[in-house]
Every structure is written in structure tokens, then in C-alpha cells.
Amino acid sequence: MEEIVFDVFARKNRGEPLTHIGYLSAPDREMARVYAWTTYDEENWFEMCIVPRSEIHLVNRTDGPFAGRGAG
């Protein structure tokens, strides 16, 4: 079975923004939930989310005036 890459986001307190805290590979969503909770348990997270990396899509235009340029 092919593993799926999931990005992991969490927030420490209600109302705070979600923060990307890492990523993991798992065979399915249920195992990804278990892996995320046990891998990133060093904090007392209020909320943690997983997102399959294949479901993250760029919003900004790739042909815009600053495409391909870093900050600064």
C-alpha cells in the first residue's frame, strides 16, 4: 500500500491561527490521525488537523509579477 503524505496543523489556544507543525506519511487518514497525535504530542494542543498534501492547492498566480522570486 502506498503511503500518503499529510501536513499537520495545530493551534495551542482557541482563536489562535492554525500553524504548520510538520508532516508525516501514513497509509490512510485514520492512521495519519494516530501518527499526528502521537508524533506531535509535545505540546498540549487545543486542536490539530491533518491535510493530505495532494489536497493543498496554490492560490496565488504562478505567472504573476513576483512569481519565482524570494522575499527581499
Please state what every model-predicted region is.
Residues 18, 34, 58-60:
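Short acidic, gly/pro-rich beta-turn/loop elements at beta-sheet edges
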Residues 27-44:
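A short, charged, amphipathic alpha-helix used as a generic interaction element across diverse proteins
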Residues 40-72:
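Short, mixed-charge low-complexity intrinsically disordered segments
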Residues 18-27:
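A short, exposed loop/beta-hairpin motif centered on an aromatic-Gly-Thr core
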Residues 14, 29-31, 56-57:
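Short, charged/polar surface micro-motifs in flexible loops or helix N-caps
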Residues 1-19:
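Short aromatic-glycine-(Arg/Gly/Cys) micro-motifs in beta-strand/loop hairpins
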Residues 9, 25-26, 49-50:
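Conserved short hydrophobic patches within well-ordered secondary structure
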